[in-house]
């Protein structure tokens, strides 16, 4: 621990597993107090029992719940938006319901949390917002990621807009664009692809391995810390060379 986030208060969505959880753990190790949320409350228990974070169930698609949670938590210095869903398919496999759900969870959830927490961040003199986007859709089109890619491109645009609107008021807003990261949800998709599914994902990687959630969390710590004080409105690519 180097206490790069000492004295800072952070709020993390989708913290029960994968990238969100890794970020919550990394923030705590760097000295931040962490309020971790997820729709799966049971999966948050170890974060609380290990003294890593205060936890609460939160459906990031529920505006009233987001607002109530923000009121309960109060002012934060760091907002990490990690909630998201990967829809598999082309435009022909994407129903109106699929489209609406993907945008609601992947984009509008960030709109909700930013609207809920930004006023107190402004009152407190500033803060850092970090949104999890993706290499897919922002830097490169990926097969069968039609609506997923569209939502992540929207996240990058949302990020730049927030950064531009509040740059003179102490708010920094950046997004992280991971490549293929080994998380529980990614392993579920690999299993659904059948035997050799994980190996198929690995074969697409120039570095011949998958990324780790901890590698994404390390970048999130940097963006949350004062070390990145001159950085805002940027989509940070961390993909093991996938887009080369």
Predicted feature locations:
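C-terminal substrate-recognition "lid" of short-chain dehydrogenase/reductases
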Residues: 111, 209-238, 243
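Residue(s) in the substrate-gating loop at a strand-loop-helix junction
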Residues: 134
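Alpha-helical segment proximal to the catalytic Tyr-Lys
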Residues: 119, 164-168, 229
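Short, flexible catalytic-loop segment of classical short-chain dehydrogenase/reductase
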Residues: 178-188, 225
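Active-site loop-to-helix junction immediately N-terminal to the catalytic Tyr of the SDR YXXXK motif
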Residues: 94, 140-149, 161, 189
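Substrate-binding pocket helix/loop in short-chain dehydrogenase/reductase
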Residues: 90-91, 95-103, 197, 201
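Active-site helix of classical SDR
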Residues: 114, 151, 159
């Amino acid at each position: 621990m180097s206490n790069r986030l000492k004295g800072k208060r952070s709020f993390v969505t989708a913290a029960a597993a994968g990238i969100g959880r890794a970020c919550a753990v990394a923030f705590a190790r760097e000295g931040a107090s962490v309020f971790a949320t997820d729709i799966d409350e049971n999966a948050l228990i170890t974060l609380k029992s290990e003294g890593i974070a205060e936890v609460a169930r939160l459906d990031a698609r529920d505006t009233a719940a987001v607002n109530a949670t923000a009121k309960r938590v109060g002012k934060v210095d760091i907002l990490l938006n990690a909630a998201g869903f990967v829809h598999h398919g082309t435009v022909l496999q994407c129903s109106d319901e699929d489209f609406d759900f993907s945008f609601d969870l992947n984009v509008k959830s960030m709109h909700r949390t930013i609207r809920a927490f930004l006023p107190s961040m402004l009152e407190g003199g500033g803060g850092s917002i970090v949104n999890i986007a993706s290499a897919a859709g922002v830097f490169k089109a990926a097969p069968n990621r039609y609506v997923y890619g569209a939502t992540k491109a929207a996240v990058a645009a949302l990020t730049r807009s927030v950064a531009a609107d509040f740059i003179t008021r102490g708010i920094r807003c950046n997004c992280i664009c991971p490549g293929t990261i080994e998380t529980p949800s990614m392993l579920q998709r690999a299993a659904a692809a059948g035997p050799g599914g994980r190996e198929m994902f690995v074969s697409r990687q120039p570095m011949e391995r998958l990324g780790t959630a901890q590698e994404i969390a390390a970048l999130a710590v940097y963006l949350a810390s004062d070390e990145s004080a001159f950085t805002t409105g940027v989509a940070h690519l961390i993909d093991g060379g996938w887009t080369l």
